[in-house]
Amino acid sequence: MRITGEMGNLAAWEKRLFYMCSARPTLHPRALFSDVTSDYRNPAEPVPGDEVTIRLRTGRYNVDKAYLVVDNVEHVMTRVRSESMFDYYEAKINVGTDKIYYYFKVELGRTVCYYNQIGAIKDLNPYYNFQITPGFKTPEWAKGAVMYQIFVDRFYNGDKSNDVLDDEYNYIGEHVCQVKDWNKYPAQMGIREFYGGDLKGVLDKLDYLEELGIEVIYFNPLFVSPSNHKYDIQDYDYIDPHFGVIAHDEGEVLKEGDTDNTHATRYINRVTRKSNLEASNEFFAKVVQEIHARGMKVIIDGVFNHCGSFNKWLDKEHIYRDSTDEYAPGAFERYESPYHNFFKFYSNQWPDNNSYDGWWGHDTLPKLNYEGSKELEEYILSIGRKWVSAPYNVDGWRLDVAADLGYSPEYNHYFWKRFREEVKKANPDAIILAEHYGDSYEWLQGDEWDTIMNYDAFMEPVTWFLTGMEKHSDEARPDSYGNPDYFFGAMHHNMARMGGQSVAISMNELSNHDHSRFLTRTNRTVGRTNTLGPEAANNNVNKAVFKEAVVMQMTLPGAPTVYYGDEAGVCGFTDPDNRRTYPWGHEDTELIDFHRAAIKMHKENDVLRKGSYKSLYSAYNVVAYGRFTSDDAAIIIVNNNDDEVRARIPAWEVGLGFDDDVEQLLVTFEGGYSTDRLGYHLQNGWLDIGLRKTSAVVLHKMKW
């Protein structure tokens, strides 16, 4: 009250001076930034013995002190550079062999703020500290690389002589069949249906993939297997001749009503005869060689948690027993089999012991018993080496259900450590990429996997935000639809848990062989083919929303991965409907042209491949984020509303100056897209922009 009374007697200028002198300084937390790119950690992937420079960005003259806190010890940082809006602080640390955990602390007057992987925070949470793992290096070629996933049987039939024949063998109780109509939808129980796609078909379409802008081809399983998906491997040493070459083709198919595969002599000859197997391997080596000649890489699928009941080690169907080439007896038939300890049997009911352990109880997917067999462990490790070595020289492995391998967490981690050692020894630049749902932190510590299929920090948050749908189309959640807090919260949490090195090469897919096609998710319809029928997957889809998703795919951190046919407008509920054939001759050419333009933009702007990432703006159904480096910046804005909106974006947060200009690289909207260059002028570091309904726009720093 005394101050109030005295203030009443002061002149106006004296009051202003009083307030200026007594006001607390204001810290600008949105100006704080650091990450694990080379702009803020150099070297970004240090090895033991390196001196590492750690940087922190702050607002210009906006902090009194900045500290790098390493393992809870504060190190004063030095201001080394100033720009119009920012100061940059540095500290140097020496790296040994142990992991290093760090965060930042800044002080301004009595205000204290911390900064870690999820941004500026008031209270510490070591869960999100930055981490240095000495010696953890990820393949440079994979950072931001544009990948393309091919489910081979459904891509293109380039060689009809290797097609699966009607009644060629019996699979899960019924004869297999050859689908004569390429455009037929997969049947609900279509595991016995074969469309005829093969590696010759991929070879024939390499021009298309190259023109699309693809840099990496990821193949679903290629090894010998009785299914069309081939996640039940029969022989890890050979490419399936139905995908490769059948050099010698003789024998009989099954007669009607016959379910005994020992009578399936045509199949036995095709998949067990060494001349066919070796010819298929040779052809695959030529395919990889041609892909490499075009500057592209190859990733193959490794299914090492389980094999198939047809596998030569188990030989439940007795097809190897009757082969013209010599094979050891399978563990299903004889206790004395050299492969007996490759599986876990629960009884001694030989011959034909059906008590083996199946993955999740599936008798067609015998779980491999690594803990019981050193021979099995060494064999699979040799497979890991074989395919990344000459003459095949593939560029990495995608690991199916990798966290399930073995019977204990301890063995699982032990095996993947050995697998990494062996694969990297054979091909140091090979990528090890795992399928995983949930927190992958414990496997991404530099000695097991390089990265993962990015469900948690890409597919799921993008799907929930743009469609409100679960990734199988099994559930709709209105509370997640258009919810920017959920979107950015999920992104920041999961990216932090993965770590920047792994995020940069993670497989960012909108669709794949396990989930509904993203274009189908845009109809926001809960269902599957067995409840709604396949046509329902095509109804009321929204191409404008799909294009928004593709823009996000091409601009968020990671390796954008196109599932074959997505770019051509293929729809589908979850498997098997998501495995429809590529619609050659019936493509959505406008969508293909759009993908080509989006991929071109991604590849031509290095800031979109390797730049830092920062969230900038959020509102209902609207998000904006930036990608930036020390000398470049891009802003991406998505408006998923059915109405036009205006947004005011803090472009200064990604280093754009107060009077900079930005130009439009790509904009999508209902009915199309445009790559016309359109300029915008910033006002005091802010971008005021009108957004079309259901649109996405990519803006880039204009360079003069």
PLM feature spans:
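Conserved, mostly hydrophobic/aromatic
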Residues: 56, 150, 209, 219, ...
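Loop/turn elements at helix/coil->beta-strand transitions in domains of secreted/extracellular proteins
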Residues: 144-145, 212-217, 292-299, 393-397, ...
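Substrate-binding/active-site clefts of carbohydrate-active enzymes
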Residues: 152-215, 221-391, 419, 425, ...
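Short glycine/proline- and charge-enriched loop/turn segments
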Residues: 232-240, 268, 363, 529-533, ...
